[in-house]
Design a protein with these regions (language model features):
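Conserved SAM-binding loop
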Residues: 184-185
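Positively charged, low-complexity nucleic-acid-binding target-recognition regions
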Residues: 188-200
């Protein structure tokens, strides 16, 4: 899949008030960064998601990969910074599992979020690159808008979409693998059922 092409399409459809969050690894983060710059997508922050419980390197030929890069970008450029950012929520955010984030202090660009998923997140199956729900929840805490729109172009098992539904957003996702489409559908149906039962 052509990274430049899908980023170009995201730039075309995202609103000035919106932003784009891209998960990357050491294999492709540099290339994604360059594509963003060539397209005029300004990088707001580069976040290092630190995974304390990352898998060990079994080959003994390199360091253990214990972080992933998340790029936060927008299309307005330096002169049109209209993207939404809930600064107060970023300061107030607190999680006992994050040993780096202090309550009522500015959120930093290193996030300490364990990579383990709950049983509820895995009960319908999993995806090889599935992220914990807590990662998406933190992102939406910073820039999600209730009743706003969330597009997930690589939906996988639906984690980001589940987070969006829990946040009260209108979600749309794309996925080409039928196995993961089925998992995502079950997770979304389960999430909607839980939300509906709260108001009965």
């Amino acid at each position: 899949l052509n990274t430049f092409a899908w980023l170009k399409e995201l730039k075309r459809i995202v609103k000035l008030e919106g932003s784009i969050w891209i998960h990357a690894t050491y294999h492709n983060s540099g290339f994604v960064n360059v594509c963003c710059q060539l397209l005029g997508l300004e990088i707001i922050n580069e976040i290092a998601w630190y995974k304390r419980n990352s898998f060990p390197n079994l080959s003994g030929r390199r360091l253990t990969a214990s972080h992933e890069t998340i790029l936060w970008v927008h299309k307005g450029g330096e002169k049109k910074r209209k993207y939404f950012f809930d600064y107060e929520a970023s300061k107030a955010f607190y999680s006992s599992s994050d040993l780096l984030k202090e309550k009522d202090k500015q959120m930093r660009t290193v996030w300490d979020i364990p990579n383990n998923k709950s049983k509820d997140e895995m009960k319908f199956g999993s995806h090889p690159t599935q992220k914990p729900l807590r990662v998406s929840e933190r992102i939406l805490t910073l820039c999600g808008v209730k009743d706003g729109k969330l597009l997930v172009p690589f939906a996988g098992s639906g984690t980001e979409m589940v987070a969006g539904l829990n946040f009260g957003m209108n979600v749309t996702g794309f996925e080409i693998d039928n196995e993961y489409i089925e998992i995502a559908q079950k997770r979304l149906e389960d999430t909607l059922q839980k939300k509906t039962s709260l108001f009965k």
